[in-house]
Amino acid sequence: QASRDRVIEAGSRPEYQVFIASQALDLPPGEPIPVEIAAVNKHAKTSRQAAGRRFGTLVHNVMRDVPLDADRTGIERLVDWNTRLLGSNAEERRAALAAVEGALSHPLLARARTAARCHREYPLVTRLGDGRIHEGVIDLAFVENNEWVIVDFKTDADASDRRAQYERQLQWYGFALMQLTKMPARAFLLEI
């Protein structure tokens, strides 16, 4: 009975602590990867109506599904469908269309279009030696010159109170890709 109780007690405690990259409180071990901030169009600020969680979800959903070489008609279809799905307003629709068109015309996405290895919504799980498991989903990752290029899309990247958290998130993505593939990585926070 005592042996059984010990096994039950041991089994009742989690063996690993799982955390997601977007909520990481610390940096990954090792050297940090280069993280750069890129912007689609700094001059085309959206209105106050096209901000917040719903707008971010709208843009992210479209960026997740849109072909990297989509034309305006294809982009509009996805924006319209997601606008209806999320109950977004006309201003959010207009701003999302502009954001997605801007992102797809950005040089980073042009580079991704020509990459032989390109992943979108790329899930990662990394076990750390300290009993933690890191999980994350990368918006866009591609290989260029034998190096991972990680792109994370943010509609609120200019929010200074979130910038450090976003950069930590990218550090964890880079760490995981380097651990899994043994290739160097760099990252971009793309303000859209």
Per-segment meaning from a language model:
Residues 144-146, 152-163:
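Short beta-strand-loop-alpha-helix junction that forms the active-site gateway
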Residues 1-148, 166-180, 184-186, 190:
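Nuclease catalytic cores
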